[in-house]
Amino acid sequence: MPAMVEKGPEVSGKRRGRNTAASAASAAASAASAAASAAASAGTASASAAAAASAAAAPNNGQNKSLAAAAPNGNSGSNSWEEGSSGSSSDEEHGGGGMRVGPQYQAAVPDFDPAKLARRSQERDNLGMLVWSPNQSLSEAKLDEYIAIAKEKHGYNMEQALGMLFWHKHNIEKSLADLPNFTPFPDEWTVEDKVLFEQAFSFHGKTFHRIQQMLPDKSIASLVKFYYSWKKTRTKTSVMDRHARKQKREREESEDELEETNGSNPVDIEIDPNKESKKEVPPTETVPQVKKEKHSTQAKNRAKRKPPKGMFLSQEDVEAVSANATAATTVLRQLDMELVSIKRQIQNIKQTNSALKEKLDGGIEPYRLPEVIQKCNARWTTEEQLLAVQAIRKYGRDFQAISDVIGNKSVVQVKNFFVNYRRRFNIDEVLQEWEAEHGKDETNGPANQKPVKSPESSIKIPEEEDEAASVLDVRYASAS
């Protein structure tokens, strides 16, 4: 019996993982009987009972059964319990009797696609951030009250207040509690806000509470601050606009005078009682007095009876306004909308004109080609000498004109050319031809005046002068 018990661990180690239900049951029974005999001989009932219970609880472990049966006393039973527990834990780590092999246990790893990864990152970058989405659970009254509190107490505009509300998932209480924790961005004026302010200012002037009706997002303090920064940069009315306005005013006044003269009533003429004593004045002097009174009465009647300039009343509008109160408000609203649209067009046209004027103020200087300034050269080439002789034939002693024709020679150098090359190019004969053609009285320079010699005239190259003189003598002789 002891020998068989010692071989138990080896056998159980070789057959690990392949025990059947029958072998497990027989092993459990033998282990229980061995534990009972050991407990009776040693007198340690508690230790043997614990060993038997552990052996019965693990029927698949042959090592536990053999060690528990071979324990002669309590100490050996405790050692066999520790070894059996380590074996069972190793079996559990190995998956309860085998490895999980097969395609059903493998993870599906996709292929690496860098283009797809870059596309996903680009899509994430291009996605915008949602800052507001309406919710049906919120009523318009609560939403307006929340926006008003955010504007008045904390300085938020409508977009910032709605963004805070959307961040807290449309919870007004949390949003109101979180509003003091942040400082809103400074008030910024967009192009549309500036255009609306200019239109409202043209309508209402400095009545800022009426301007605020067209810009409800702006406070009166913000409107006043923007007004003082805007009025310094706005362009004044052009002369053309003032002239057109003046002509229109004169035309309207002439039309009003014609209407008053054609359909005037003598009763409308007001006569000052203090002037009744002047009835004995000759009739030649009464005409301008009556005309003056007539003009004054016409101005008073026109101011009383006619609407402001540019305004008129149509019969259809009067009938629609007199029908009921709602129709009157509708007509007035339509007229206001038309007026606003027309003034917007005017403002856009003025802005376009001002931009074009700014472009015209620069002039054409940036587009002008730069003038090429030639430096004066002391040496006379063959072409320059021939050109100088031809210029003398055309302009005579006009040294400035000859200098301009040559381009790179000053007036002093041209005078020195007269002296140095007088004999070689027969300049005297050329001057005689010019005088015969234009007359001696039209000579434009003193013939006896000696030219001022400059340091540049002292530079002479004999070989070049002889060569140029020979070439020009041949050309001039053939031409003559």
Swiss-Prot record:
Residue span(s) of domain SANT: 184-235, 375-426
Domain of life, source organism: Eukaryota
SUPFAM superfamilies: Homeodomain-like
Protein keywords: Chromatin regulator, Coiled coil, Isopeptide bond, Nucleus, Phosphoprotein, Repeat, Repressor, Transcription, Transcription regulation, Ubl conjugation
Coiled-coil intervals, chain numbering: 238-265, 328-363
Segments for region (Interaction with HDAC1): 72-251
One term under GO cellular component: DNA repair complex
One biological process term in Gene Ontology: negative regulation of gene expression
Annotated compartments: Nucleus
Family matches, as PANTHER family: REST COREPRESSOR 1, REST COREPRESSOR COREST PROTEIN-RELATED
Subunit note: Component of a BHC histone deacetylase complex that contains HDAC1, HDAC2, HMG20B/BRAF35, KDM1A, RCOR1/CoREST and PHF21A/BHC80. The BHC complex may also contain ZMYM2, ZNF217, ZMYM3, GSE1 and GTF2I. Interacts with REST. Interacts with the SMARCE1/BAF57, suggesting that the BHC complex may recruit the ATP-dependent chromatin-remodeling SWI-SNF complex. Interacts directly with GFI1 and GFI1B in a RCOR/GFI/KDM1A/HDAC complex. Interacts with INMS1. Interacts with SOX2.
Domain statement: The SANT domains may bridge the nucleosomal substrates and the demethylase KDM1A.
Name recorded for this polypeptide: REST corepressor 1
Natural source organism: Mus musculus (Mouse)
